Amino acid sequence: YFKYDLKLPIWEQLQAVRPKIKDLVALCAEIGIQPMFQNHSGQDYFGAAVWDIFSIMREYPAAQFSFAFDILHATCEGGKSWPLEFNLVKDHIGAAYFKDFKWEGRKLVTVPLGEGQVDPKYGEMLMKTGYSGPISLHVEYLGGDPKDPTVLKGFREAHLRDMKTLRSWLRRA
């Protein structure tokens, strides 16, 4: 991740990232992999607002540089405006991340898919674009030692439950 220094002008910092991205895209092409950028929430994260990284990303074909679009972070940052960010970048989504959260005071707390702030319409909107790339279901809310058989059983149940929710969101299209 790149981070902004909030004591310095944002636009100049954005322009300073441009050549770094250019070098990264060139290196990835040379070794045969596709770079992706995950949007991440936070007051100083480059890409948190989506438009900033997209102002650079749009200079490249999606096959050369794309988003790992994270709906949790887009919702956290954009609230109800996440559809604007989605529509801005939808042709450059290389991977779609699904996870959910709720607010506890000012703190973001991850929760099972469908139990928080993330709008199920994201799945529908994604599928209506004709998207056929990777979908990543995150279960960051799980805790415990995965070596413990009891905990592992709970992990499996959580994955199955969240996968059922995800399938229902994707079928809405």
Regions found by a protein language model. Give the residues of each.
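Histidine-acidic metal/acid-base catalytic patches
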Residues: 50-69, 75-173
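Active-site acidic/histidine proton-transfer and metal-coordination neighborhood
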Residues: 1-67, 76, 156
